[in-house]
């Protein structure tokens, strides 16, 4: 303690002694000073003695600590100060210096704190007086330089010292003094020191304010831990030990700043700054001590974390605060948010500060700040969004309530406000200083005004750059920025002084970085009125443009800013389209447009262009950066053999090297240089891209409507109504005209003045929406005319004024001035005339006041208006004209012609005028928006980039295209290329196809590779373009889609160029060049092929030119280019599934173009296709199959290329790829091999070249031989190719294909059967095709043998088929053997039968039935149904050959054969087939007998007989019914009715005999008549089977005998009739055979005859048919049915044979040869068969029930037969009946006597008649016996002995 005091005393003593010792002090005028020093010295001495400590405590206090204060100390300090005060007031610099030096040290070491009240001025502290004294030492420029320096030091110490506190006016005074020293001092060192001091002071003032908030935040954190149950209890600040003297200052000292301190800093004007009080009152509210202090606690808490961040960002201070505050603040904010949001509803006491809406404004900004600085990991925005405006209110109310209960307000909180006020005052003063106008004329760099302006701006910049969170968020400062700083900037931002202008720009940049969320409107004004205006106006100077564009470079490099500008302005209905305009302006600058008028040098123009390009590229880079999360780098992953990596993996996999490969494309180097990107701030709810897009669309509609309105108002309004943006009522439209400021005012006037009814309604509504209440007439008129320009026509003005007057009176009904509306109307008109007269330059003689008054005489209902009234109007108009609304042009002023700007000087003058106007506008606008609170959205979504890019892609493209086109500067080119790269990236990421394609096409165009004359002009920039294009392909391949076409086209051309560059002859396809060699070798002046190929040169060549071309494109062959191109193809494995398909698709397209070139087809791309196929084969199969779909299709086309070399290359490549692909094998049920090998099929199908076909077959054969074990689904294609080869006519192709097929069927099937099952059908089909190739019969037979071999596989391995699953899952497992095995084999055999020549088809038929017979036992019932559907196709009439002879042969051979085979199979598998097949067989037989083929017809009946005889025993009743019905049907359809009805057509050829034929002759002829059936060979049991093999039908011979003269239709008819006759007879025979077994009847007849010859009486010659015939299986009804058929047939034959006339006619017409036709055999055999059946039934005991009917039928039939016999005239006819009669008589003789009686009595007379004929002996013998029996039975006579006992039953 003692030591401290001692130090202090030592200082004081020395200083006082030094002052006393000064010789000046000795002078009289310093007596007071001298005395004060002496008194002070004495006191010090006395005090020292009094307080000297006892011995032991000498070291008790640390000498470094300031002493503890007590009341006495204050008084002492006061005493000590007086001598220094007097010393400072002395005029002697030395004394002043000494005094200042001592004060500075005392303050520095804490010995002088000045905390005591000032005894001279109540309400102030001593320290204020001390500072005032120090400041007073500066007396202006004449002050001693040493003193100046001491003042600066003392003030800096005072402001920065830890030990004293100075506030408000005192701080201002200290700052002002330093400022003035800087301006006034002539000494450069002093100036520099003053400036540095100012900077440091400001740093301290603002840093203190921020630190205090941080302390408070820490304090609150402690408090929070201490009291968990409350959100905030009034925190008692426990201050740190190093500042124990902090005290709470009464509120009034804070609130009310005494006026003498408020002067501005500028020395020239020390006026009192009154505005301070007005400003600060509402901002701080009435009671800062309670409510507001606490209200800011939250601000400080929330701001603390940002403080640490910002310090790091700005100047690296406060590193120690970096970590803890973050954690502290995080927890505070989190809890606060949760509780506040929860409690909002309950808190009602809201303390709103004096200006009423302060609460809400402040709240908005604060809560927004909390969100902005939202701590990572806490969902603050979620918690905060619901009630932004209320949150802060509730916090403040909560604080207020609690502070009432607490023991006393916390000093810390109050103190913080004083610090804020200090900062605020300094900031505001600097703003005001910067606004001071400069003197007119060219600015003088040394003038105080300019230096002051520059210094103030520099200091403001420094404050802003180092601003902490309180400054950035506190309402007071934000308002200060809006009201003072922005207005100041709007004045300085157009300064012609470069330094001022530049500083303004820097300040603007800082504002944009750190404060943009609060300054939405201000930023808009800045861009619109200053930046863009300077860029757009042609007169602005290069320097200005340059500085603006430099600034823009900074802005454009920050992604957050760029996106924010778009979201907040372009997507805001009421804001200008700043982003769009910015891009357009930059694009124009980058294109070098408009530089002519600027008078710029070329160098300047180029540097400006580069800057413009740089900005554009920066913007695009930002957009890339912003959307980088959407981009997947193809090179950081591979698509081979794995799925896409997950989101996490992808982000981890973006290795630094891949990211940095393209500078800042994946991640721009740094965006937070300005701190913009460091945190996002949010005000208006959430950032919803869709919502903004909708707004943008609406805005575009409105803008379009406004454009249309400018051209034609009605059209504009109609458009907006159609788009739903404007209502239809006049009121809606009027409101729109009021509110929409962008409308052209002239057009608005025209529209309102129009005489149209609707327009008038709108005009009335428009005027009615004005409220003129309480306004004087002129003000009302001014207000009315502000909205539009009056139209020119008097009538229109008339209407408007009339309505205006009416509305004015309506609003001001209490006025007494105007008698009526008419008065107002006339007066309004006169005012407009007056304004025109007084202010129009065209009017030379201006109207005087008297004239004006005179003009208005008598207008008030014939009275005058008061003269003084009119006089006042005149004066007002003369002073200020009525200005109508001007239309503000946003567009760039039209290019001023050369005359306008004759010289640079004039241009400058014009520009300065423009700048002044601009400054006025900007200032006015700035002031207008200074109180507007506009919500600012901080963009966070990457989706915004899409609409941004869509909006601006054209100006970007224009700038880059023009740059590349017309400028050879490498930097320009590299910027353009980089820009295009970024643009492509964005278009890619968001898949905006049109734009992407446009950029890629532009890039491709500038490679000059695709232009016909391109390569000759190739420069470095074109080479770079090629490299860029390749890079794009490498980095953006996943997104390129159709743009691959351009890229691959260029790469294809590049290869050609490289060949020329290296002088290598391109490898054309030999075939085409061969033809041209002859013509080329002769002419030595002609260019080599490749030059012609590229379209480089015409016929004759300048070889020098070629050399230079080779040189210029040599660069394209550089290793780096070659490798890069190669990398595109090798890297194709990394493209994703869709991208690789696009890539391949366009590679194929380019390859196609190369190959289609008429002059020089090339195979570059084709080779690349093969390469990428190799690379990508490892992809997952799903992707690979999509790739191959495209490549395979390409191979299809290339393999069919007319140029054989191309096709050979394609097929060979296919072979190699296939081999590799097959090595991979294939799992069951996949079909990739099938897809892969399909091109072989296609080529085989379409390419007719034997060479290629042979090659395809060889390739496939090679695959089979080497890869058989791996082939699965590929077998299908292999068989398909062989199938196509099988029908070839070239022996070697067929031979090789068949050999291989045979190898597969015999060996491969054996080993790998399960793998081949899927293509088993194809194999069989293929063999069938070989069998059907008529050119190679041996192969055909061998093929059928192999099919038979296949059947063995099916039989041996049914399980394999059952287990095989495939596409046809709907096939039941048990049916798979059939569907995939048996059916194909049998079907193909049926195809062979249907397609081949006789010997092959016969073999096929044999094998087919052989298979059925061999393996049929394994077949299911429904399989047989399918099978016979195939088999019966053999008989399908539609499929039979057309030619008659072939058809006949077919029927005679194949059908015949098949029919017998079917019956055999049926018999073999009767049990299964009876239900299945019988109906079909009957139907088929029925079909056979209907064909015009005798052989087939016979076979049909024959087969019917076989089937029934062989299987009848097993037939059911139902089947017998079917059998009988079938027989019946055949019978009915084959009765040749036409024989009876046929009539010769008139004009029939005459009979062969020319002479008329007499009856006798006819009769003799009739006796020789020919039986139609004579030609039929008798059927014996043995020859039945051979019948089918009879080569040609006998009927055919008969047909040929038919008269050649007969007409063809008749010939056909007769042939058919003949066949029907044959069938009838066959059928009778069949029935006989079925019922009684074949040959039985014939034997019986023979025996009957023999017996008759012997005249034997032994009637036991009964042939036993019991065992064999089917008689016993037929029911009586069925037998009767058959009988009916037989008898009908018999009757028909009888009718025909009796019809002599008809027979003659037929004979004459050529039917049946030389003699008349008859049907004797049919007549007799049908009856014979009928009789046998009836007699058999008659004697059958089991049919006793039918005997009665049988007897009746017998009697009728027999009597009818006998009667008919008696009518026969012809000998031969009677002879035919011999056997019949024998049969009849024999049978009757054998019946019992009873029955015999009945019969004999019935036939007796007829038999008597018969005896008159000349009968043969046998018949006579039987008749004799018959009559004898009659005698005995009727007991007429006794029987002879040998006959006794016979038939007595």
UniProtKB/Swiss-Prot annotation:
Which keywords are on file for this protein?
Cytoplasm, Golgi apparatus, Guanine-nucleotide releasing factor, Membrane, Nucleus, Phosphoprotein, Protein transport, Transport
**Pfam families associated with the record:** BIG2_C, DCB, Sec7, Sec7-like_HDS, Sec7-like_HUS
Q: Which SMART domains match?
A: Sec7 (SM00222)
Gene3D superfamilies attached to this UniProt entry: 1.10.220.20, Arf Nucleotide-binding Site Opener,domain 2
Q: Which InterPro entries match?
A: ARM-type_fold, DCB_dom, Mon2/Sec7/BIG1-like_HDS, Mon2/Sec7/BIG1-like_HUS, Sec7/BIG1-like_C, Sec7_C_sf, Sec7_dom, Sec7_dom_sf
Stretches of Low complexity bias are at: 664-684
- State the post-translational modifications: Phosphorylated. In vitro phosphorylated by PKA reducing its GEF activity and dephosphorylated by phosphatase PP1.
Q: How is its activity regulated?
A: Inhibited by brefeldin A.
Q: Where is the composition biased (Basic and acidic residues)?
A: 46-58, 644-658
Tell me if Thylakoid is a UniProt keyword of this record: no
According to the entry, every stretch annotated as the SEC7 domain falls at: 709-840
Pinpoint motif Nuclear localization signal (NLS) by residue range: 711-715
Q: Which GO terms describe its molecular function?
A: guanyl-nucleotide exchange factor activity; protein kinase A regulatory subunit binding
Tissue specificity is: Abundantly expressed in kidney, somewhat less abundant in lung, spleen, and brain, and still less abundant in heart.
| Location within or outside the cell | Cytoplasm; Cytoplasm, Perinuclear region; Golgi apparatus; Golgi apparatus, trans-Golgi network
Record-level GO BP terms: endomembrane system organization; Golgi organization; negative regulation of actin filament polymerization; negative regulation of GTPase activity; positive regulation of wound healing; protein glycosylation; protein transport; regulation of ARF protein signal transduction
Chain segments carrying region DCB:
2-224
The segments labelled Disordered in the record are: 46-65, 216-301, 350-413, 634-687
Q: Give the residue ranges for region: HUS.
A: 557-577
Query: What main location does UniProt list?
Result: cytoplasm
Tell me, how does this one assemble? Answer: Homodimer. Interacts with ARFGEF2/BIG2; both proteins are probably part of the same or very similar macromolecular complexes. Interacts with FKBP2. Interacts with MYO9B. Interacts with PRKAR1A and PRKAR2A. Interacts with PPP1CC. Interacts with NCL, FBL, NUP62 and U3 small nucleolar RNA. Interacts with DPY30. Interacts with PDE3A. Interacts with KANK1. Interacts with TBC1D22A and TBC1D22B.
This protein's name = Brefeldin A-inhibited guanine nucleotide-exchange protein 1
Originating organism: Bos taurus (Bovine)
């Amino acid at each position: 303690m003692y030591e401290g005091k001692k130090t202090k005393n030592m200082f004081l003593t020395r200083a006082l002694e030094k002052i006393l010792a000064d010789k000046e002090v000795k002078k009289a005028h310093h007596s007071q000073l001298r005395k004060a020093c002496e008194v002070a010295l004495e006191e010090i001495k006395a005090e020292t003695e009094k307080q000297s400590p006892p011995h032991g405590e000498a070291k008790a206090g640390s000498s470094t600590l300031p002493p503890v204060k007590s009341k006495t100390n204050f008084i002492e300090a006061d005493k000590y100060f007086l001598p220094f005060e007097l010393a400072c007031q002395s005029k002697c610099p030395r004394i002043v210096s000494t005094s200042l030096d001592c004060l500075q040290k005392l303050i520095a070491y804490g010995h002088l704190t000045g905390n005591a009240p000032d005894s001279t001025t109540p309400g102030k502290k001593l320290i204020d007086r001390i500072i005032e004294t120090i400041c007073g030492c500066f007396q202006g420029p004449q002050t001693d330089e040493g003193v100046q320096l001491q003042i600066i030091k003392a003030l800096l110490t005072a402001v920065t010292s830890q030990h004293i506190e100075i506030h408000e006016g005192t701080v201002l005074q200290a700052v002002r003094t330093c400022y003035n020293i800087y301006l006034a001092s002539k000494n450069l060192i002093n100036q520099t020191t003053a400036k540095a001091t100012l900077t440091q002071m400001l740093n301290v003032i603002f840093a203190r304010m921020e630190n205090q908030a941080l302390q408070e935040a820490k304090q609150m954190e402690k408090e929070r831990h201490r009291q968990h149950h409350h959100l905030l209890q009034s925190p008692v600040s426990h201050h740190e030990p190093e500042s124990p003297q902090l005290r709470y200052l009464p509120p009034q000292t804070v609130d009310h700043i005494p006026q003498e301190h408020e002067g501005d800093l500028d020395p020239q004007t020390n006026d009192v700054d009154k505005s301070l009080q007005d400003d600060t009152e509402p901002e701080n509210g009435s009671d800062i001590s309670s409510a507001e202090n606490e209200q800011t606690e939250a601000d400080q808490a929330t701001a603390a974390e940002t403080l640490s961040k910002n310090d790091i960002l700005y100047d690296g201070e406060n590193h120690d605060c970096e970590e803890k505050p973050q954690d502290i603040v995080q927890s505070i904010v989190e809890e606060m948010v949760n509780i506040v949001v929860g409690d909002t509803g309950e808190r009602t006491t809201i303390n709103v500060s004096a200006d009423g809406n302060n609460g809400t404004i402040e709240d908005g900004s604060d809560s927004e700040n909390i969100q902005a600085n939202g701590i990572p990991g806490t969902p603050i925005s979620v918690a905060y969004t619901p009630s932004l405006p209320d949150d802060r209110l509730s916090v403040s109310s909560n604080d207020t309530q609690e502070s009432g209960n607490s023991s006393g307000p916390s000093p810390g909180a109050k103190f913080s406000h004083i610090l804020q006020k200090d900062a605020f005052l300094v900031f505001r003063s600097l703003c005001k200083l910067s606004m001071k106008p400069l003197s007119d004329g060219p600015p003088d760099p040394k003038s105080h005004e300019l230096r002051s302006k520059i210094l103030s701006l520099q200091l403001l910049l420094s404050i802003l750059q180092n601003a902490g969170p309180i400054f950035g968020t506190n309402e007071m400062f934000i308002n200060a920025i809006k009201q003072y700083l922005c207005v100041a900037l709007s004045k300085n931002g157009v300064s012609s002084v470069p330094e001022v202008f530049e500083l303004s720009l820097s300040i603007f940049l800082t504002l944009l970085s750190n404060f943009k969320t609060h300054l939405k409107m201000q930023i808009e004004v800045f861009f619109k009125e200053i930046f863009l205006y300077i860029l757009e106006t042609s007169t602005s100077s290069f320097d200005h443009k340059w500085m603006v564009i430099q600034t823009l470079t900074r802005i454009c490099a920050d992604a957050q800013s760029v996106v924010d500008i778009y979201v907040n302005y372009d997507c805001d209905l009421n804001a200008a389209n700043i982003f769009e305009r910015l891009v357009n302006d930059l694009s124009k600058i980058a294109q070098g447009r408009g530089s002519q008028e600027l008078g710029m040098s070329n160098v300047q123009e180029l540097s400006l262009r580069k800057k413009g390009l740089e900005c554009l590229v920066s913007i695009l880079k930002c957009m890339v950066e912003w959307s980088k999360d959407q981009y997947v780098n193809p090179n950081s992953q591979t698509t081979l053999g794995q799925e896409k990596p997950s989101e996490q993996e992808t982000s981890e996999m973006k290795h630094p090297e891949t990211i940095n490969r393209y500078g800042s494309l994946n991640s721009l180097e740094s965006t937070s240089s300005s701190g913009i990107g460091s945190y996002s701030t949010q005000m208006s709810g959430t950032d919803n891209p869709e919502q903004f897009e909708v707004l943008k669309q609406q805005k575009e509609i409105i803008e379009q409507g406004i454009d249309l309105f400018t051209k034609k108002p009605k059209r504009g309004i109609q458009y907006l109504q159609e788009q739903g943006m404007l209502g239809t009522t006049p009121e809606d439209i009027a409101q729109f005209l009021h509110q929409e400021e962008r409308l052209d005012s002239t057009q608005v006037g025209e529209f309102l003045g129009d005489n149209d009814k609707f327009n008038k309604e709108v005009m009335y509504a428009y005027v009615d929406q004005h409220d003129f209440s309480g306004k004087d007439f002129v003000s009302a008129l001014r207000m009315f005319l502000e909205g539009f320009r009056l139209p020119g026509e008097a009538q229109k003005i008339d209407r408007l004024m009339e309505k205006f007057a009416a509305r004015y009176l309506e609003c001001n009904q209490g006025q007494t001035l105007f008698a009526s509306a008419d008065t107002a109307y006339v007066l309004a008109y006169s005012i407009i005339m007056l304004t025109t007269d007084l202010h129009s330059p065209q009017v030379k003689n201006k109207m005087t006041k008297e004239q004006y008054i005179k003009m208005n005489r008598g207008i008030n209902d014939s009275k005058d208006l008061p003269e003084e009234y009119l006089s006042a109007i005149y004066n007002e108009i003369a002073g200020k004209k009525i200005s109508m609304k001007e239309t503000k042009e946003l567009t760039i002023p039209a290019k001023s012609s050369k005359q306008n700007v004759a010289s640079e000087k004039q241009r400058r003058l014009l520009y300065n005028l423009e700048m002044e106007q601009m400054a006025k506008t900007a200032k006015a606008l700035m002031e207008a928006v200074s109180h507007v609170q506009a919500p600012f959205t901080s963009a966070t979504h990457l989706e915004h980039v899409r609409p941004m890019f869509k909006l601006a892609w054209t100006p970007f493209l224009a700038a880059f295209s023009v740059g590349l086109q017309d400028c050879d500067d490498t930097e320009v080119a590299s910027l353009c290329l980089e820009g295009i790269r970024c643009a492509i990236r964005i278009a890619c990421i968001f898949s905006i196809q049109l734009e992407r394609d446009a950029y890629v096409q532009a890039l491709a165009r500038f490679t000059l590779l695709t232009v016909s004359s391109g390569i000759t002009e190739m420069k470095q920039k074109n080479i770079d373009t090629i490299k860029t294009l390749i890079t794009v392909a490498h980095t953006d391949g996943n997104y390129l889609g159709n743009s691959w076409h351009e890229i691959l086209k260029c790469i294809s051309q590049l290869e050609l160029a490289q060949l020329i560059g290296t002088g290598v002859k391109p490898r054309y396809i030999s075939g085409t060049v061969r033809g041209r060699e002859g013509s080329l070798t002769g002419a030595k002046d002609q260019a080599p092929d490749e030059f012609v190929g590229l379209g480089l040169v015409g016929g004759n060549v300048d070889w020098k030119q070629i050399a230079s071309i080779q040189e210029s494109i040599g660069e394209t062959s550089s290793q780096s280019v070659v490798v890069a191109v190669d990398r595109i193809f090798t890297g194709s494995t990394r493209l994703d599934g869709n991208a690789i398909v696009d890539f391949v698709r366009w590679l194929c397209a380019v390859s196609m173009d190369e190959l289609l070139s008429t002059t020089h087809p090339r195979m570059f791309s084709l080779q690349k296709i093969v390469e990428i196929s190799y690379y990508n084969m490892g992809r997952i199969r799903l992707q690979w199959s999509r790739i191959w779909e495209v490549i395979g299709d390409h191979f299809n086309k290339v393999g069919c290329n007319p140029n054989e070399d191309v096709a050979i290359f394609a097929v060979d490549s296919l072979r190699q790829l296939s081999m590799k692909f097959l090595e991979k094998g294939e799992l069951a049920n996949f079909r990739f091999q099938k897809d892969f090998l399909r091109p072989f099929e296609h080529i085989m199908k379409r390419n007719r070249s034997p060479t290629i076909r042979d090659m395809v077959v060889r390739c496939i054969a090679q695959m089979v031989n080497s890869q058989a074990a791996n082939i699965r689904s590929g077998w299908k294609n292999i068989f398909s190719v062989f199938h196509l080869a099988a029908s070839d006519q070239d022996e070697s192709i067929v031979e090789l294909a068949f050999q291989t097929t045979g190898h597969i069927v015999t060996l491969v099937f054996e080993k790998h059967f399960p793998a081949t099952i899927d293509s088993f059908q194809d194999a069989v089909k293929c063999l069938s095709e070989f069998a059907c190739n008529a050119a190679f019969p041996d192969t055909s037979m061998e093929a059928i043998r192999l099919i038979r071999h296949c059947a063995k596989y099916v039989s041996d391995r049914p399980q394999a088929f059952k287990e095989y699953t495939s596409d046809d899952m709907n096939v039941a497992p048990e049916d798979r053997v059939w569907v995939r095995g048996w059916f194909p084999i049998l079907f193909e055999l049926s195809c062979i039968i249907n397609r081949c020549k006789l010997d092959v088809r016969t073999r096929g038929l044999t094998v087919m039935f052989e298979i059925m017979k061999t393996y049929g036992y394994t077949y299911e019932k429904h399989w047989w149904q399918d099978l016979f559907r195939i088999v019966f196709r053999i008989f399908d009439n539609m499929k039979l050959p057309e030619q008659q002879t072939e058809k006949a042969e077919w029927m005679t051979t194949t059908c015949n054969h098949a029919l017998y085979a079917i019956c055999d199979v049926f018999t073999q598998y009767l049990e299964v087939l009876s239900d299945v097949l019988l109906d079909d067989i009957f139907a088929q037989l029925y079909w056979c007998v209907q064909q015009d083929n005798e052989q087939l017809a016979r076979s049909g009946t024959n087969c019917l007989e076989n089937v029934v005889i062989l299987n009848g025993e097993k037939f059911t009743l139902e089947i017998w019914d079917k059998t009988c019905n079938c027989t019946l049907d055949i019978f009915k359809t084959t009765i040749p009715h036409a024989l009876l009805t046929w009539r010769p057509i008139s004009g029939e050829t005459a009979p062969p005999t020319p002479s008329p034929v007499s009856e006798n002759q006819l009769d003799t002829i009739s006796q020789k008549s020919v039986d139609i059936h004579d030609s039929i060979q008798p059927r014996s049991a043995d020859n039945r089977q051979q019948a089918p093999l009879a080569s040609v039908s006998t009927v055919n011979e008969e047909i040929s005998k038919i008269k050649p003269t007969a007409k063809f239709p008749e010939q056909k008819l007769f042939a058919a009739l003949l066949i029907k006759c044959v069938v009838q007879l066959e059928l009778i025979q069949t029935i006989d055979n079925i019922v009684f077994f074949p040959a039985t009847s014939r034997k019986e007849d023979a025996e009957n005859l023999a017996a008759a010859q012997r005249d034997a009486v032994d009637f036991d010659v009964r042939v036993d048919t019991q065992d064999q015939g089917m008689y016993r299986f037929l029911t009586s009804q069925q037998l009767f049915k058959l009988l009916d058929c037989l008898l009908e047939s018999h009757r028909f034959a009888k009718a025909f044979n009796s019809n002599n006339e008809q027979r003659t006619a037929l004979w004459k017409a050529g039917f049946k040869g030389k003699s008349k036709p008859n049907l004797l055999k049919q007549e007799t055999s049908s009856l014979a068969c009928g009789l046998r059946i009836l007699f058999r039934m008659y004697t059958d005991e089991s049919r006793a029930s039918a005997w009665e009917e049988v007897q009746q039928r017998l009697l009728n039939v027999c009597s009818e037969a006998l009667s008919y016999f008696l009518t026969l005239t012809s000998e031969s006819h009677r002879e035919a009946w011999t056997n019949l009669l024998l049969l009849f008589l024999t049978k009757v003789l054998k019946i019992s006597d009873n029955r015999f009686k009945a019969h004999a009595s019935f036939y007796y007379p007829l038999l008597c008649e018969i005896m008159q004929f000349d009968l043969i002996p046998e018949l006579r013998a039987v008749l004799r016996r018959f009559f004898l029996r009659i005698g005995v039975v009727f007991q007429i006579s006794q029987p002879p002995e040998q006959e006794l006992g016979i038939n007595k039953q």
